[in-house]
Amino acid sequence: MRYWYLRLAVFLGALAMPAWWLYQAWIFALGPDPGKTLVDRLGLGALVLLLLTLAMTPLQKLSGWPGWIAVRRQLGLWCFTYALLHLSAYCVFILGLDWGQLGIELSKRPYIIVGMLGFICLFLLAITSNRFAMRKLGSRWKKLHRLVYLILGLGLLHMLWVVRADLEEWTLYAVVGASLMLLRLPSIARRLPRLRGRPGVS
């Protein structure tokens, strides 16, 4: 397997954070509401992994190193895993598995609907991130996986609605996301490989 060391690093890094958070919860180091803290951290982790996934193509074009693309799918699947854990933690720690409360939560907190839409789109990408789906869907596969841009928008909107007035951290992620989208514009994406030959760019 090519770039096995990079794949292993991604695996260990993505696995380490939830393990560390669970350990912190075990020793009561997550504050007065550890359940909510876990929900928040898993959601933020999913957003960070989504941004990392989107960064792989521009990095490959800029550096010419194929290793970035080698872990793109892996990062995307970890993003889905974190989102699934985020949703599961919400159901357990916030809802308390009281499904009757879900309707009330949806009416009081519309950002949950936004988050669910993003999760459904992410689920579609996760189950089609394999060679069989690529062959089966053909040209439709690329169109389907453009949902990643919608997912990013929904994720940022979901986070914005949650943080409300505390916009400093959200702005950072929004700027990174917008920058990654700009790098995918055809007029800019075509120029990225040319930068490799310029002085100061390796």
Swiss-Prot record:
Binds 1 FMN per subunit. Coiled coil: none annotated. It comes from the Bacteria. GO terms for biological process: protein repair. InterPro entries: Fe3_Rdtase_TM_dom (IPR013130), MsrQ-like (IPR022837). The keyword Repeat does not apply. One of its GO terms (molecular function) is metal ion binding. GO terms for cellular component: plasma membrane. The chain crosses the membrane at residues 8-28, 42-62, 75-95, 110-130, 147-167, 169-189. Its cofactor is FMN; heme b. Keywords: Cell inner membrane, Cell membrane, Electron transport, Flavoprotein, FMN, Heme, Iron, Membrane, Metal-binding, Transmembrane, Transmembrane helix, Transport. It is found in: Cell inner membrane. Pfam families: Ferric_reduct. It is a multi-pass membrane protein. HAMAP family: MsrQ. NCBIfam families: PRK05419.1-2 (NF003831). Part of the MsrPQ system that repairs oxidized periplasmic proteins containing methionine sulfoxide residues (Met-O), using respiratory chain electrons. Thus protects these proteins from oxidative-stress damage caused by reactive species of oxygen and chlorine generated by the host defense mechanisms. MsrPQ is essential for the maintenance of envelope integrity under bleach stress, rescuing a wide series of structurally unrelated periplasmic proteins from methionine oxidation. This is Protein-methionine-sulfoxide reductase heme-binding subunit MsrQ. The gene is msrQ.
